[in-house]
């Protein structure tokens, strides 16, 4: 899979490349692309099937967390998930375990309104006192990734609404 190859090459270079620097894991302004993955991401100027190091727009992407493999693994099949993405960063990157939901709290699916943005759908967590206690710890972190669709492509709007990726 192209997304996994991108991340594998990126990490391999950080650990064993000509200038290894693990600090760049989260802020490197480059990745590894071939023509197919560059087209997928909308990055011009990459030709051929071989992966190579490619500079990225630092206003859009930096490091492993903005790569498609991570974005796809922390989303649902057809939509982003601020909850999954925020939980992933809090628990796997910041090593901050989050409490499980109380057993008597039902899972509340987001609003089915097809015209609202993902953020608008998930902001119900903030308004519901039974949900807000835990979701305030992860949803804002996940909102920071809303410029990435469910498979990691950059976007500036969703359903005609500008993306609000503020935390």
Model-derived segments and their meaning:
Residues 1-54, 108-122:
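Amphipathic alpha-helical substructures
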């Amino acid at each position: 899979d192209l997304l996994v190859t991108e991340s594998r090459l990126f990490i391999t270079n950080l650990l064993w490349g000509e200038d290894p620097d693990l600090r760049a894991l989260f802020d490197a302004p480059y990745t590894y692309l071939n023509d197919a993955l560059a087209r997928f991401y909308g990055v011009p100027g990459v030709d051929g099937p071989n992966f190579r190091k490619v500079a990225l727009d630092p206003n859009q992407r930096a490091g492993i967390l903005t790569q498609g493999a991570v974005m796809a693994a922390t989303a649902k099949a057809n939509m982003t998930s601020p909850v999954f993405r925020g939980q992933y960063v809090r628990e796997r990157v910041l090593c901050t375990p989050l409490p499980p939901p109380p057993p008597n709290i039902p899972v509340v699916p987001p609003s089915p309104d097809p015209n609202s943005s993902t953020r608008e759908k998930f902001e119900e967590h903030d308004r519901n006192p039974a949900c807000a206690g835990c979701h305030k710890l992860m949803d804002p972190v996940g909102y920071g990734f809303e410029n990435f669709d469910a498979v990691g492509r950059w976007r500036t709007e969703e359903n005609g609404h500008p993306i609000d990726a503020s935390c």
